[in-house]
Structures are given as C-alpha cells and as structure tokens.
Amino acid sequence: MKLTPEQILEIFNFRHACKKFDGRPLHEAEWNTILEAGRLSPSSFGYEPWHFVVVQKRELLEKLYPWTWGGQRTLYNASHLLIILARCQRDLQPDSQYLGHMMRDVLGLTPELCQAREERYATWQERDFDLTQERPVFDWACKQSYIALANMMTVAASLGVDSCPIEGFKRTEVERILQEEGILEPQHFGVAVMATFGYRAEAPHRPKTRQSLGEITTWVR
C-alpha cells in the first residue's frame, strides 16, 4: 500500500522522544517488524557493521541503570531496550574475516568480485575517508548504526509504537557490564547507541519544533 505524503508526515509528527512509557509489552509482530526494519536498513558497501541487543531482563536493566543517565526515566517502563553495537576496526579491515564472510556468504560475490571489492574498499578507506585509525573506523560504523536506528524508530511510529533514542550513557561502564554478561566481545564491538521502545503513557507536553526548510536547505539549480 502506498502512503500519501500527508500520512508520511503524520508518522514523523507522531514520533517524539518518549520519556514515559505505560509499561505494556509490545505485540510480538510489532517488535519483529521493527527489528526487520533495522535488519533491512542500508549500510555503506552493504557491510552491516552492527549487532542488535534486545534487553528485557530486569537484572541487566538494573545493572545498566546507574550508567544510563539519559534513559533512567524509561528503562523500567519501556517494553524493550535496544542496544546497538558497532563493529571495531579489526572487523572492518579490507581483508578481515568478517568482511570476507559478508562478501562471500551474504552478498554472494564470486572470488573475483570479492577481490575487486576488497581493493576498492581499501582505496576508499585509506585515500577518500582516511579511515586508518581505530576510533575513526568505529565512529564510521556507529554512523551506519544510526541509519538502522532511524529506520527502526520511523517504522515504530508507523505502527503506533513510541521510542526514545539514548546517547546519555557512560560507554566504558556499559561495555564493561555487557562484557561481563557475555554479550559483548570488545575486540569486535563497541556500544554505538541505545533506544527504548513502548507505548506512550501521556501525550507530548509541547508540539514538535524544528527549523524551517528554508533555514536548513540550499538549492543549487
């Protein structure tokens, strides 16, 4: 079904950073659709440098709570906490095992095309974007993860599900907890961003505010 422009804008106006959920669990079909939106999201070179961690276990939420100051109003009343992990430099080197798996097993490239893709990626990484150090490579992977998160929040809104993106957390402590829980392998992943999902307990306290299109758009014709 094709949505009208008005329906699309209605979805975007519905979405807001929900600070209070009503505690109801999401329907399984809704949550699976939101996850699928993340899975089907685009990524540079098609390398999908992310992993989605879905947290509902109360004990883990309690461990994360002191270090997630930006989500303390929603951690306990949301239906799901999503933690998106981003790949580290080790997995994003042109000749890494992970990228080899992606090219062969996921993208289905022939050995010849894998070699050509590896060379093109290496040239782009080194000469175009200067991604030769650990932190810039991880930050690039985080940027890819935000594409997936944006799609997940938009699809959630289209289903009448609310969300709240969270960057307010102590990364080192959250990664330590996830490592202790056997969820995160620090040689492969770091935490990119979090978000909570559920049903709003109350309407937004004020209307959505944004700059006008004229302020943020330059036309070159």
Short names for language-model regions:
Residues 1-221:
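Acidic, surface-exposed loops and disordered segments
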